[in-house]
Amino acid sequence: VTGHVVYRAVVPESEFPEDLKWNAASIWVGPNCHLVHYPLRGGKEYNVVVTFHSREQEQWGVTDGSKEEVLSYFQEICQKARQLIELPKSWRRWATADREPIETWTFGRVTLLGDAAHPTTQYMAQGACMAMEDAVTLGEALRVTDHNILKAFDIYQKARVARTARIVLSSREMGKIYHAKGVQRLVRNDLWRGRPTERFYDAMEWLYGWNVNNCLDAVKNYQGNVA
């Protein structure tokens, strides 16, 4: 358990502030916390997500949350962002978890995928995405081995270990960047200030540019290395 808590809520478009109805994922960052909001269902709803470092000893799980707890971690947030915390009528609370990347998650005729194999924090928003990539890769490995379970599992695991480990470790680092304080915060702000959007996109090409063909190619690359 990481000690990082995530609150999520959905707000109807009719109740969302007009000056914050941006057609993009928007983030407000601060020491040990951040807030994200973005449109859903073509702008009919807005997702509001807050993350903070909990003061409590957390146990993994999902429960109902309270606005009072959220506000206690965002006392010095600017008023424009604070109004977003006031909007939801109810919150869901996640105590998050990850683990050190591992090289093996296959055991005989049993293999794992998604969070069961490589749980990650939410800072890269890649938990479900990695599970889908795993599924495509595993399916292709089964196809090319004519459903030889042991060979397919071996190919699948080798094809996925490095990328999923990079996600886990990068997500941790992104959390540090979002939640920086003191001098680290000043360095972050200086690096981000005035940076063209294209530079951010280029830096994340390895992540968001990945598609089904990459999964298929990864299987092909490892297919000849499995006896």
Specify the residue positions occupied by each region the protein language model found.
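A non-catalytic, amphipathic alpha-helix used as a structural packing/dimerization or gating element
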Residues: 69-76, 80, 151-166, 210
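Conserved mid-domain beta->alpha element of the FAD-binding
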Residues: 7, 37, 91-179
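Short, charge- and proline-biased low-complexity linear segments
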Residues: 23-26, 76, 169-179, 223-227
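C-terminal auxiliary extensions adjacent to catalytic cores
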Residues: 193-227
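C-terminal domain-closing interface element
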Residues: 178-197
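Conserved FAD-binding catalytic core of PHBH/FMO-like flavoproteins
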Residues: 1-89, 102
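Alpha-helical elements of Rossmann-like donor-binding domains used by nucleotide-donor carbohydrate transfer enzymes
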Residues: 6, 69, 73, 134-137, ...
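Short alpha-helical linear motifs
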Residues: 174-182, 212-216
